[in-house]
Curated annotation (Swiss-Prot):
It comes from Schizosaccharomyces pombe (strain 972 / ATCC 24843). The keyword Phosphoprotein applies. This is Thioredoxin reductase. FAD binds at S11, G12, P13, A14, I40, A41, Q45, N54, V87, C145, D288, R295, Q296, A297. It is found in: Cytoplasm. It is an enzyme of class 1 (oxidoreductase).
Length: 322
């Protein structure tokens, strides 16, 4: 059993930013970066992104994996201890907090005075044929992140979804694509009236009602065609597009705390006044695990900074009361 002042669970931009601040504050943070935790490699969703062009400091853009490697190197430089194991159980019912590692659930728990949960969220996927082949090679789950990438410029694109996110992403993509198709499984949008009105009024948008994606096709390197099916007639046809964007929601990685802390209706951790602070003193939630609105690398990093500063303050108060 080991005890640490502060433990970070997760290794995306939120986790590493928190680690950098805490390490520079000489609090000797320990990060559990996970081993395919939540089905994603250490580093989080950025590791599945090829070109990141909207993170400050990289005027020519940077590969997502390279960016996460830079985060990791910077965390290590200032003294963060990074452990490539997955936390499988977390007990927030008493202090110090207790946690167990995957494969060692029956052993004595490790403990920490403060915990920052930065486990992120994963995009919902359709799991259609060809999806894995063309993921980040024509298929994406973030139009804001990837829409401006050269492979999509002046090309026909498609968005899957019928809610506000789909409407917003489709309109965003009209800045770059020659045309944007919106695939809606039903005969009406779930989007709010004002968002639906804007979408339907956009001359570069065509909504394909009662339509689902069946198969992603291409040349083995980039997507160039989508097999679609009409849910009323079962007719299958081809839709020539160079980009397919999913806007069907995200799944926050809250399994560790789902029964211990309040979640919102979408499953995200509820925090206090827009900060990473939660209803449990000393436990903080940073990044996409508590952010269903922005979901950007830069906002996650900012959230990690806030969590670190709040954790520092909490630990100082804890020392004063001892």
């Amino acid at each position: 059993m080991t005890h640490n002042k502060v433990v970070i669970i997760g290794s995306g931009p939120a986790g590493h930013t928190a680690a950098i601040y805490l390490a520079r504050g000489e609090l000797k943070p320990v990060m559990y970066e996970g081993m395919l935790a939540n089905g994603i490699a250490a580093g989080g969703q950025l590791t599945t992104t090829t070109d990141v062009e909207n993170f400050p400091g990289f005027p020519d853009g940077i590969n997502g994996t390279t960016l996460t490697e830079n985060f990791r190197a910077q965390s290590l430089r200032f003294g963060t201890e990074i452990i490539t194991e997955t936390v499988s159980k977390l007990d927030l019912s008493s202090r110090p907090f207790k946690y167990w590692l995957e494969g060692a659930e029956e052993e004595e728990p490790h403990t920490a005075d403060s915990v920052i949960l930065a486990t992120g969220a994963s995009a919902r996927r359709l799991h259609i044929t060809g999806e894995d082949t063309y993921w980040q090679a024509g298929i994406s789950a973030c139009a804001v992140c990837d829409g401006a990438v050269p492979i999509y410029r002046n090309k026909p694109l498609a968005v899957v979804g019928g809610g506000d996110s789909a409407a917003e992403e489709a309109q965003f993509l009209t800045k770059y694509g020659s045309k944007v198709y919106v695939l809606v499984r039903r005969d009406k949008l779930r989007a709010s009236p004002i968002m639906a009105k804007r979408l339907l009024a956009n001359p570069k948008v065509e909504v394909l009602w009662n339509t689902v994606a069946e198969e992603a096709q291409g040349d083995g390197k980039l997507l160039n065609n989508l097999r679609i099916k009409n849910t009323n007639t079962n007719e299958v046809s081809d839709l020539q597009v160079n980009g397919l964007f999913y806007a069907i929601g995200h799944i926050p990685a809250t399994k560790l705390v789902a029964e211990q802390i309040e979640l919102d209706e979408a499953g995200y951790i509820k925090t206090i006044n827009g900060t990473p602070r939660t209803s449990i003193p000393g436990f903080f939630a940073a990044g996409d695990v508590q952010d269903k609105v922005f979901r950007q690398a830069i906002t996650s990093a900012g959230s990690g900074c806030q969590a670190a500063l709040l954790a520092m303050h909490y630990l100082e108060e804890l020392e004063d009361t001892d």
